[in-house]
């Protein structure tokens, strides 16, 4: 039935219900505001104090950094000025090694092989999906905006790039997964270096025939039948830094073996559980110092910038393009993916990891941020420890959405600067190489610049042109690190949601095993009690 004027009465009732709902929510909000007490304010500040202090530290650090630029401090003065920030980095990096090992061992030991296999597969699928999406966003944005207009002659260059071969870089990645010495893996990574070697090469047959006809002396002919050739050959080398990939692989295998050992491996499992708990308590202490360290890290980096004008012009457009790409991925794609899988509010989840994101912005290292990320996810967002201990260390090592997006975008920007038209095949090569190279980028500051060489080499672009973008990389590195940490954290939430049935069944099995263990102890206790009753009062042994 409809009204005489043709209006649908249901539409009017829906509008009335909507208006009534809005009025009720408004009244409820007013009541909540009116009922706020001093205790509520204190409780809010207590719960979110760390986050507020960290946000204030970022703002104050930015203001302080721009304020002291006018003093033109020397390199030594800048080092002294940034010293509190350096202390924070050292404290966080101190905890990374034991945290990666203990968390992965305990996480893998707490799961059976079937559950850990399913969880690992879900994590890898998530990592690959988000990385491919990030690369796609970076390529589309840089093609649409086209920040590489103009010529590179007027652009500022900075730094020096070491040559590297793509094949050697990928082989190094695999070599680092299996370190020959676990102690050395704690402070060194394998890296192929190059040295010049001179070879004697035999001349081709047609050239030798001419030479022998010209030369009558046989000995002279034999000497001239060879010529010298120089070649850069790969030799084994090493660089300072934790081999995170090797430790991750070893810890996962070690934890899986301990879990399968059941009762025999309980002592080792308890040891790593205690170690993990001790590290997290140290993190709680360091978190009080984090705002001060972040303040001076940001202030020192801003004061260190040589020329603010470099950020303008062509590099300014490049910077804006990277920021737009990272924002689309971090603010739209990742939250949408989290909501689509879990049907939960992603912004509530992101609010719980806000301090980890700000720490990533300040430290520019996803590995250094790992202790804070653990604490935020487990305490604020109540993510299962078995998930965080498994997903976060692996994610901090191989899941680099921000880095993948940046590398694909920067490679095409360098092609545009050189007026180099890329065809579809070359763009596809860039996307595949950027995805693979981001896996090899360790969670250390400015690792993206190193792997960028691999991406440029894959399509024949000049690697020296990386020096064009180094001037703004310190800032963009912080943004892509924040994106990486956000991707790892949301990934932990998604994997936990998808693995909830395995986790619940694991809890049930653990409960049953405890009951069985108690039941097995009871007969023994009864027998021992009976034996004690049968013993004589005089317990001395008779000769």
UniProtKB/Swiss-Prot annotation:
Tissue specificity: Detected in retina (at protein level).
Intrachain disulfide bonds: none
Positions contributing to Na(+) 1 binding: 395, 399, 484, 488
Chain spans, region Disordered: 521-543
Intramembrane residue ranges: 347-377, 427-460
UniProt protein name: Excitatory amino acid transporter 1
Subunit text: Homotrimer.
Residues in compartment: Cytoplasmic: 1-47, 109-122, 262-270, 342-346, 378-386, 496-543
Annotated source species: Ambystoma tigrinum (Eastern tiger salamander)
Catalyzed reactions per annotation: K(+)(in) + L-glutamate(out) + 3 Na(+)(out) + H(+)(out) = K(+)(out) + L-glutamate(in) + 3 Na(+)(in) + H(+)(in); K(+)(in) + L-aspartate(out) + 3 Na(+)(out) + H(+)(out) = K(+)(out) + L-aspartate(in) + 3 Na(+)(in) + H(+)(in); D-aspartate(out) + K(+)(in) + 3 Na(+)(out) + H(+)(out) = D-aspartate(in) + K(+)(out) + 3 Na(+)(in) + H(+)(in)
Known role: Sodium-dependent, high-affinity amino acid transporter that mediates the uptake of L-glutamate and also L-aspartate and D-aspartate. Functions as a symporter that transports one amino acid molecule together with two or three Na(+) ions and one proton, in parallel with the counter-transport of one K(+) ion. Plays a redundant role in the rapid removal of released glutamate from the synaptic cleft, which is essential for terminating the postsynaptic action of glutamate.
